């Protein structure tokens, strides 16, 4: 993996929603988040690893929200692996046309929050590892490289990674190229727990 060749302090930023959709679309098996973090850090010193999630609030007929148990389990396991978890609720907007037809839209991403955290930590790290394929990070990556002297690496699913992000990052690793990242068998709840906190 290219990222393990660099030395110094490394900070890892995991865009949970982007990662979830990548797993769902392109890979089979249960992702081992401990292996993911170990691969991102390599032989370097971990400064911080942050996992960003969006919690889905699903209500049943009684109005009670579901998925809380899965979300707590998922966050607990991430903490055990060494991640700091930041979460926000999925915001649901309902609008009605003049004819009374309802349209439901969802908003819940961490792009701006992740970029802000990257800026805050820039003077303390040597390398950033971004686990996301989202092109919205390109300008932030360019700034961190040119103005802060940071090495920025990306781990993502290549088929759904922005070409601009691939072009600008210092190294890229496809999720499928990380040894033992996906278990063919194991607790079936793992992906379900991830599903309960991202959309």
Model region roles, listed by residue range:
Residues 1-199:
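Terminal and domain-boundary accessory regions
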């Amino acid at each position: 993996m290219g990222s393990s060749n660099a030395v110094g302090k490394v900070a890892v930023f995991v865009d949970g929603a982007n990662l979830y959709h990548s797993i769902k679309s392109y890979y089979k098996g249960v992702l081992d988040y401990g292996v993911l973090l170990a691969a991102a850090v390599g032989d370097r010193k971990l400064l911080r690893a942050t996992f960003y999630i969006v919690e889905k609030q699903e209500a049943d007929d009684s109005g009670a929200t579901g998925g809380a148990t899965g979300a707590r389990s998922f966050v607990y396991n991430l903490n055990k692996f060494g991640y700091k978890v930041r979460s926000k609720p999925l915001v649901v907007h309902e609008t009605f046309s003049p004819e009374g037809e309802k349209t439901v839209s969802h908003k819940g991403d961490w792009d701006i929050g992740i970029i802000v955290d990257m800026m805050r930590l820039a003077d303390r790290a040597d390398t950033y590892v971004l686990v996301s394929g989202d092109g919205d990070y390109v300008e932030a990556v360019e700034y961190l490289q040119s103005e802060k002297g940071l090495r920025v690496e990306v781990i993502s699913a290549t088929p759904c990674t922005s070409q601009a992000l691939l072009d600008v990052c210092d190294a890229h690793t496809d999720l499928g190229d990380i040894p033992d990242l996906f278990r063919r068998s194991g607790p079936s709840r793992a992906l379900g727990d991830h599903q309960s906190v991202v959309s």
